[in-house]
Amino acid sequence: MPEKIVIYGLSAFSEMMYYNFTKYSDYTVVGFCVDQEYMKDESFCGLPVVAFEEIEEVYPTHDYKMFVAIGFSRMRNRALLFNKAKAKGYSLVNFISPHAIIRDDLIIGENNVIQSSVDIDLFVTIGDNNVFWT
């Protein structure tokens, strides 16, 4: 059974990551979350949107994982939201495109994106919360 994830964010990058996870991963995206102050709609990409402040009531940490979908323009915010999700106890998932070239010895953290046409060579260690895009 595929693992279920919630995407943190409601941006064009969030929509792109929803598409990528849906089409190219074994994860099932079940919804989105955003900080209460940014709640504008109850759905995004046809899925429910939940206030982050209430997220663990709807999507408990033992049943769901998370992906923080904040792009390049708000890298500081991405780090803050990553830390908030970790503080609530969520495991954060990576997205690795099936069209990327990844070596078997890759050591990788959490909440990373490796898009298509990216080539990660031998002896590489990647930390948390990075985006690799060509």
Label the model's feature ranges.
Residues 38-101:
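Phosphate-bearing ligand-interacting subdomains
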Residues 17, 81, 133-134:
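Hydrophobic alpha-helical segments typical of transmembrane helices
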Residues 14, 74, 120:
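Glycine-rich nucleotide phosphate-binding loop and flanking beta-alpha elements
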Residues 12, 76, 107:
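Short alpha-helical
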Residues 98, 103-104, 109-110, 114-116, ...:
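Left-handed beta-helix
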Residues 1, 26-28, 62-63, 91, ...:
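Short loop/turn motifs at secondary-structure junctions
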